[in-house]
Amino acid sequence: MAFWSVAINTAFGVGISLLPVRYTFPGRRALSALVDLPLSVSPIVVGLALLLVYSGRTGWLGGTLEAVGLQIIYAPPGMIMATAFVSLPLVIREIVPVLHEIGTDQEQAARSLGASPVQTFARITLPAIRWALLYGVVLSLARSLGEFGAVKVVSGGVAMRTQTATLLVEERYQQFGTENTITAYTAAFILASIAVLALIVVTSLRPKEEKL
């Protein structure tokens, strides 16, 4: 689940970051403000919003999707959507300042020499934002691994199907017995270790000028 969430955030994070920085259009400021919405509302609210839209026959789109055999709520797709939504701003907020900093001079020069938009992005823009993108992806991964509220609402916590590591921690911690407590703390420690290790590795690999 975390893998798919990070993949979605990588693609959408770059695209949404470019829109308000490189293009002028009505509603550009509104888009910039909406980027922070997932950080401003409770993850529980995010989960309830997804229920409102995709829940079975009562959701706005749930009945239509179920008619074609696609289940969103209480299934992996809903969990991926919830996790991607709450962690997307972490990617965008790393990339946007770098795009402002590098400006558009090199991109305009490349286009004046005949480079296509795709070539310009691949050879100029992407290399310039690569460390910001990587750091944002790592933050997104850490957030995805630790997400609890939104996932709990949309997943149902079905063991071996929609139960994430964070939901397992909660379930085992609330159960009696030394073994369950040890399992809960072990899973929590592993999640925290993965997040910390990923951040340390990326920070260590960053060029010194990128760290300043």
Q: Where do the PLM segments sit?
A:
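Membrane-interfacial helix termini and adjacent extracytoplasmic/periplasmic loops
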Residues: 28, 47-84, 118, 155-158
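Transmembrane alpha-helices
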Residues: 37, 85-87, 91-99, 103, ...
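Transmembrane alpha-helices and adjacent helix-loop boundaries
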Residues: 39-47
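Short hydrophobic faces within alpha-helices
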Residues: 37, 105-113, 184
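Interhelical loop and adjacent transmembrane-helix boundary motif
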Residues: 151-197, 201, 208
